[in-house]
């Protein structure tokens, strides 16, 4: 299926009041889901902000994306320390793809070459479909078109600030083949939305070392043939295409999956 359409975000079917989105974005949301106020999770993603570094993912989120682990590690009482890989380029794009003779991991390390066009129009990985959008309306339209329904679940993370050590409290499977939309670290609002086939999304309830309870959107890749072999060996001592590999998703992102149990949007 062409990736020109996406899906919508949540975990427990709760209504959250949005406070920062423009009226046009909020009105459009209400026209699609009149019984669900715009979640604060989404309104926060729409806040314009100046770049704090030259990378397309904010530096404070890199440890979340760079924590790689096995699917069988997702169980209560499992301990995680965020950040088990060191390559910035590989953290942002764990799938290797040649680009004019230079791999993405090397290219992304060259901070002066970061741009919307470079990141959004770089080659796709194996089994990946991606598309960049610059508004919530475009994201909603694409997600609904992709899934063919407004019955969708939207999920996001809420990692605690300044906390790197967590223990798993609970794990819930959300769905397969989710559409992921990442807010990129550009001055204007830009989302990089993509779907990688043969993936499973989970919501993992975590407790930080200071007792703060959080939840982490987690994606497990069952087809890892296109993953960076150096990254996988550094983190897990495995090779691409052998075992499922999982990673956390940072706070500035959302996953969309079909909702088969309710008649409206479910936000988790």
Curated annotation (Swiss-Prot):
Stretch list, region 2 X approximate repeats: 166-222
Keywords assigned: Glycoprotein, Repeat, Signal
InterPro entries: BURP (IPR044816), BURP_dom (IPR004873)
PROSITE patterns in UniProt: BURP
Membrane-spanning parts: none
List of glycosylated residues: 259
Residues of the signal peptide: 1-22
Region (3 X 6 AA approximate repeats): 50-106
This protein's record includes keyword Signal: yes
Each Sequence repeat, start to end: 50-55, 83-88, 101-106, 166-183, 202-222
Domain BURP intervals: 68-259
Tissue specificity: Seed.
Protein name: Embryonic abundant protein USP92
